């Protein structure tokens, strides 16, 4: 058998084939090695079907059979509504003219401009990859957030939204979004909903500020009235209690005095029943004695005497006579 003689061209073809085979082998050995960063998880598919989830680290995949999708599970992501912030070099630009997202109707039929931020994190990498199309995940979160916030704003008055109900709306929106996102199986958890800015539209902002000033004045007057009430009412109550106590004391005194008079009358009457003449004489003498004690001069005159000039009046008459003589 004759062995053919290889030419240099033949040798170059053989060398190229060997190099190609070696290249395929090297690529097949090196390409299945994947590094999962500390902030990610890897979702591995085998023939397009979910197979396993990889933790951070170095992992080997079967070439041309297994593929990995890296999912940022530790990164807190956010969606902005009613405004956008974009970073250009070292500065952040703020755009807040997205009225189709921020203008809402309140429960008392007012229009309010609401800007808010939703922060969320991926907690189920498998659900995140398979349950919703990649181009629809972000829009799904935005649609749910807008529906929830619109519902909560529409149930409340504008002053409540801007004041005491603001924190309650944030907490309620977070809870409602988590319920809906869990129901559709998106694999994310909302960590916070923050109402950044809640104001009336610019066209009516001046009128609304006037209303706020009037409300503040009303509250101030109410507080002043309450302060005056708290100051005057206790004083009036004290004066009233004092008058009541004085009246009760006077009433008790009169009642006790009346009871004493009744007891005295009863005792006198009992004596009178026993000896009417003696009792009558005694009462007469006691009454006469009480009267005479208050009189300086006492004159006893017999009622049968006529043209009687008492010695007491002689001194007065003599003084008048002497005075008349001197005048003459």
From Swiss-Prot:
Domain of life: Bacteria
Pfam name, any one: Band_7
The keyword Transmembrane helix is annotated on this UniProt entry: yes
TM helices/strands, residue ranges: 13-33
Membrane association type: Single-pass membrane protein
One GO cellular component, as annotated: membrane
Subunit structure as annotated in this protein's UniProt entry: HflC and HflK may interact to form a multimeric complex.
Name of the featured protein: Protein HflK
